[in-house]
């Protein structure tokens, strides 16, 4: 499977260069056999990347399949390849998932949760018992 003209293998990158890499990508692959929470997926989605990830660990919670990205069967190269091909073949779908991913991640931002907790505390303080 020769994809060297269209794929750049980045390898492990220092934290300070990640945003630069995300800005250069359309699709982020996470073919993990096991995965914790999925922070990489969240970072990628916050930067408008569409995540194609294994259906494992916390990834199904983060990557809403068919809404903000795509999930594939763990260990299935064919399933992963089909998901990638569907995105490349349908640019409007890629753009839709990219836009939805940004919107989705913003709903769970630190600032948003801080404001929600702040509002909750204010209501609790001002509520008469």
Model regions and ranges:
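A short, well-ordered alpha-helix in the C-terminal region of glycosyltransferases
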Residues: 79, 86, 93-107, 116-119
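Short glycine/serine-rich donor-binding loops of glycosyltransferases
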Residues: 38-41, 59
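Short alpha-helical donor nucleotide-sugar binding micro-motif in glycosyltransferases
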Residues: 12-13, 20-25
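Short hydrophobic beta-strand element within catalytic cores of glycosyltransferases
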Residues: 50-53
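Nucleotide-activated donor-binding/catalytic signature segment of Leloir-type glycosyltransferases, i.e.
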Residues: 1-13
């Amino acid at each position: 499977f020769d994809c060297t003209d269209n794929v750049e293998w980045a390898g492990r990158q220092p934290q300070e260069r990640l945003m630069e890499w995300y800005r250069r990508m359309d699709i982020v692959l996470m073919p993990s056999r096991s995965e914790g929470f999925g922070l990489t997926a969240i970072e990628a989605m916050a930067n408008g990347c569409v995540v194609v990830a294994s259906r494992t660990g916390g990834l199904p919670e983060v990557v809403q399949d068919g809404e903000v990205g795509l999930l594939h069967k763990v260990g299935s190269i064919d399933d992963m390849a089909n998901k990638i091909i569907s995105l490349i073949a349908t640019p409007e779908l890629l753009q839709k998932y990219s836009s939805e991913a940004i919107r989705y991640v913003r709903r769970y931002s630190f600032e948003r949760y801080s404001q929600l907790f702040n509002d909750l505390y204010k209501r609790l303080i001002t509520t008469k018992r």
